[in-house]
Amino acid sequence: MEEQGTGIRVEALSAEFAAQAAAWAERLELPLHDEAADFAVQVGADGLQIQQLGPQAPGPVRVDFVEGQAAHRRQFGGGNGQMIAKAVGIAQGVRPQVLDATAGLGKDAFVLASLGCQMTLIERQPLIAALLEDGLARARADEEVGAIVGRMRLLTGNAIERMRAWEGEPPQVIYLDPMFPHRDKSALVKKEMRVFRPLVGDDLDAPALLEAALALASHRVVVKRPRKAPIIDGPKPSHSLEGKSSRYDIYPKKALKA
């Protein structure tokens, strides 16, 4: 895995965004000019995005809670009946407080927030956290989506350390979706994964993540896994909910009540 700050540059997509690009470069401690960079953090009219560079590179990755996939899932995603809702314990009169300790681009957290859950998100990779921060800021300006992202609070840093040092009321549910070691050689791997993997690597500390989550959550821990992946080393889940490509392993501690 590349170290943060190597092979990545920041660039403005047009002159009017030069000041914003310079501010992000300073904050992320990345150069504005690096001809040998493998990735570019780009600032433009659509906000912040990461673009892998090179002839075979997929399109840019950005966070958009207002349009596209997030909007479609919000309108047609199945509401309280979808598997993630059942996994975290959403039921009539029950909207648990959820900590998503592996936030990524915030897609799952947004779904849960749209169903009424108060969400705290932790993202450890600074570039992905920056995309998330930018996407949340743009979404707050939208009349419909602003109320949803108002239920999403972003923290950055190492989730294990943050959970171990947690102060205040613990989250009722902790949701984990660790990056699973990659075995799919097909060309159809999602562009997010193609961009993320060199930046993030695999979550080899998943057992420690689970251990910290089980120590902190007051009611349950939910782990999302590829359907055929082994469970995380450690305590066994009580049961699982299985979909076409994913599985939710449930580790209950206490019943969620209305």
From Swiss-Prot:
Disulfide bonds: none annotated. It is found in: Cytoplasm. The keyword rRNA processing applies. S-adenosyl-L-methionine binds at E123, R124, D177. Residues 232-258 are annotated as: Disordered. GO terms for cellular component: cytoplasm. Its EC number is 2.1.1.242. Gene3D superfamilies: Vaccinia Virus protein VP39. One of its GO terms (molecular function) is rRNA (guanine-N2-)-methyltransferase activity. The keyword Phosphoprotein does not apply. Keywords: Cytoplasm, Methyltransferase, rRNA processing, S-adenosyl-L-methionine, Transferase. Signal peptide: none annotated. InterPro entries: 16SrRNA_methylTrfase_J, SAM-dependent_MTases_sf. Pfam families: SAM_MT (PF04445). It catalyses: guanosine(1516) in 16S rRNA + S-adenosyl-L-methionine = N(2)-methylguanosine(1516) in 16S rRNA + S-adenosyl-L-homocysteine + H(+). Specifically methylates the guanosine in position 1516 of 16S rRNA. This is Ribosomal RNA small subunit methyltransferase J. The gene is rsmJ.
